[in-house]
Curated annotation (Swiss-Prot):
Species whose genome carries this gene: Methylocella silvestris (strain DSM 15510 / CIP 108128 / LMG 27833 / NCIMB 13906 / BL2)
Molecular function GO terms recorded: indole-3-glycerol-phosphate synthase activity; phosphoribosylanthranilate isomerase activity
Catalysed reactions, as listed in the record: 1-(2-carboxyphenylamino)-1-deoxy-D-ribulose 5-phosphate + H(+) = (1S,2R)-1-C-(indol-3-yl)glycerol 3-phosphate + CO2 + H2O
Keyword annotations: Amino-acid biosynthesis, Aromatic amino acid biosynthesis, Decarboxylase, Lyase, Tryptophan biosynthesis
Biological or metabolic pathway of the protein: Amino-acid biosynthesis; L-tryptophan biosynthesis; L-tryptophan from chorismate: step 4/5
GO biological process: L-tryptophan biosynthetic process
Name under which the protein is recorded: Indole-3-glycerol phosphate synthase
InterPro entries linked: Aldolase_TIM (IPR013785), Indole-3-glycerol_P_synth (IPR045186), Indole-3-glycerol_P_synth_dom (IPR013798), Indole-3-GlycerolPSynthase_CS (IPR001468), RibuloseP-bd_barrel (IPR011060)
Listed EC numbers: 4.1.1.48
């Protein structure tokens, strides 16, 4: 585990302990099971693939440890609607406060504004957080293999299955991929960001994609900024992408989302430019 992940793990475990005092697990468990049923996260991605479209998990990220504030006018419902209008399959909502200025309330607000399924994007260590995610509207949770051992990953997986939630398991290298493939989860995400340097390289997805079995859905995360990037990865069999920062920096998020998925349309000339 890198130094930054160690520091994150320390404060997350403190947060979990404090949350358990505020709301005992039995209460949280009831709240999670009483929430309206999960929207199918994997199904939404498969629906895009079924009509030969790229599937985008569009992320709401207000800030990050490496880039600081990314979007000042951060309005989760408005952003969710813009992403849906632009053609996203699913939403990813940062709920970590100290590092990303996220909040659990963003999750429920985004989900209520659209029909799209939502991922709770956070650092999960304890099944309590999975129930917390479902109680706040999440349809899918993230398991970062760099953060947890195999026993913890298994506990998180079982909690998600208990709640009929989907799981995105995230890897950064081949060793983590080998561990991830032992879990019962359809979505395998390759994070192109080096957690030591914070630099991104799409070559990581290109290299690992061929090692992901065809019964899993490969997801490329981080460093994707254009339709050309998507096409480059599609050539390696990857048609699902998680994109946040490059879209969060755009004034017109809906238009930017559409451009990412289908490319910019060429300007009209001659009679077509005037509707003739």
């Amino acid at each position: 585990m890198t130094d930054i992940l160690k520091s994150i793990a320390l404060y997350k475990r403190r947060e979990i302990a404090q949350a358990k005092v505020r709301m005992p697990f039995e209460t949280l468990e009831r709240k999670a099971h009483d929430h309206d049923p999960p929207r199918g996260f994997v199904k939404a991605i498969e629906a895009k693939h079924a009509v030969n479209q790229l599937a985008l998990i569009a992320e709401m990220k207000k800030a990050s440890p490496s880039k600081g504030l990314i979007r000042a006018d951060f309005d989760p419902p408005a952003l969710a609607r813009a992403y849906e209008e632009g053609g996203a399959a699913c939403l990813s909502v940062l709920t970590d406060g100290p590092s990303f200025q996220g909040d659990l309330s963003f999750l429920e607000a985004a989900r209520a504004a659209t029909h799209l399924p939502c991922l709770r994007k956070d650092f999960l260590f304890d099944p309590y957080q999975v129930y917390e995610a479902r109680a706040n509207g999440a349809d899918c949770v993230l398991i970062i293999m760099a953060c947890v051992d195999d026993e913890e990953a298994g506990q998180l997986t079982r909690a998600a299955h208990d709640l009929a939630m989907d799981i995105l398991v995230e890897v950064h290298d081949e060793a983590e991929l080998t561990r991830a493939l032992r879990l019962e989860t359809r979505l395998v995400g390759v994070n192109n960001r080096d957690l030591r340097t914070f630099e991104t390289s799409l070559e990581l997805t290109e290299r690992l994609a061929e090692k992901i079995p065809s019964d899993r859905i490969a997801v490329s995360e981080s460093g994707i900024a254009s339709h050309q990037d998507c096409l480059r990865l599609k050539a390696h069999g990857v048609s699902t992408f998680l994109v946040g920062e490059s879209l969060m920096r755009q004034k017109d998020v809906a238009a930017a989302t559409k451009d990412l998925l289908i490319g910019k349309l060429p300007p009209l000339h001659g009679k077509h430019a005037h509707g003739l």
